[in-house]
Amino acid sequence: MGLVCPYALDVPGGVQNQVLGLAAHLRGAGHDVRVLAPGGLPDEADGLDPAHFTSTGAAVGVRYNGSVAPVALGPLAAARTRRWVAAHAVDLLHVHEPLVPSASLAALGAARSPVVATFHTATPRSRALRLAGSALAGAVDRIDAGIAVSPTARDVVRRHLGRDAVVVPNGLDVGAYERPDADVRDGRSAGAPPRLLFLGRAGERRKGLDVLLAALPALRRAHPDLEVVVAGPGARALPPGCRSLGLVEEADKRALLRSADVFVAPHTARESFGIVVLEAMASGVPVVASDLPPFAALLGGAEDPAGRLFRRGDPAALAAAVSVALSEGRGRRTERARALARRYDWSVVGPEVVGVYAEVLAERSAEGAS
C-alpha cells in the first residue's frame, strides 16, 4: 500500500496523524506500507520504519482552509513524487486531501495503481475548490473511491467535485488515551484549583481561543481560582491566570488531558471531524464543545450529548457550559464519552478503510477479467 500525505509529517496536524495511524494499523495487519510526504518524520511516528518513508522535500507554509498548511511545492517536489510512484509498484495508492497542491495531487496525476482518496476538508464555500474541481477534472477521474471523514466532509465533496464518497471516520489509538488505573487528575492534589484545557493553534481564529478568553471574566466570577492551560503551536498573549505551554509532545498532551477538569473546544468553523474532541473523550475528561455538527456527532448527538455543547462564538454560553461541567465532574457523561470514543479505535476504523480497498481492488480485477 502506498500512503500519500500532502502535509509535512513532522508538523503537528490531524491529517498527518491519520496517515501515521493508518500506516501503523496496516502494518499491524500484515501489509507492506510505504509513505510519501513533505518534510521529515516526527519523533513519534507510530513505529514507521524510516526506510519506508520518502520525503518530497522541505515544506513551506501556505494558507489553506483557514490554516497554514506545510506543503512542498515546485517542480523538484513534483519530480520526486513521480519517481516515487514509478519506483513503488503498489497494489493501491491512498492519497489524503487529493486536491491540495502538494504530494497528493502530484501522486494522483502520476498514479497507475487503483486510487483511494480521503477528503478531510470542511470548507462550506470555496472558490478554490470549485475551480480545482473544474480544472483538475482529469485528476479527480483517476480516483476509484472517495472516503470522507464525516458527513460534513462528504457534503463538501458532493458540492464542489460533483461526486460521492463513503463516510469512514478518523481513527484513534484509544488505548493510548485510556488510563483506568491512573489518578483521574494525573497526580494533581485533590485541593488543586480547577483546570481548563485548550488544545490547538493559538493563532488560528477558527480554533476559537478568542471565544474562550472572552468568557474568562464570567468564569472567574464563578470560579476565582480557575486555571487555564493553552497548549499548541503559535504564540499568543494571554491574561493573568492563563498558562501557555506551546507545542507539546504526544505523551505530554495525553497527560494534560488526564490532568484537566474540563476540556474546551471553542472552534467556530471549518472543522470536518474534531480529533481533539475525540482525544478528550477517550481520556475521560469532561468535554465542553461548540455546537459544530461534527463535534455534536462525536458526542452522540445534540439531544443528549456525552459532553456539554454551547452555541459557537458565544462566550456567555461557553462560560455557562463550563460551570455546569465543573459542577458535574466525571460521571455518566464521561463514561458514555469513553464508550463512544471506542467506536473510533483503529481496530474498528482500520478494517473499514481496508474494506474500501478490497472493493476497489475487486472492481479493478473484474474489469481486467472482462
Protein language model regions, located:
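Conserved donor-binding/catalytic core segment of Leloir-type glycosyltransferases
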Residues: 183-207, 213-217
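Membrane-proximal helix-turn-helix segments that form the acceptor-binding/catalytic region
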Residues: 123, 128-146, 159-160
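Carbohydrate-associated surface elements
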Residues: 39, 152, 171
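A charged, aromatic-enriched C-terminal amphipathic alpha-helix characteristic of glycosyltransferases
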Residues: 29, 182, 331-357
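Conserved acidic donor-binding segment of nucleotide-sugar-dependent glycosyltransferases
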Residues: 300-316, 323-329
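N-terminal strand-loop element at the rim of the active site
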Residues: 5-12, 20, 24-75
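Acidic anion/phosphate-binding donor-loop and adjacent secondary structure
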Residues: 130, 155-158, 172-192
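Short hydrophobic beta-strand element within catalytic cores of glycosyltransferases
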Residues: 286-289
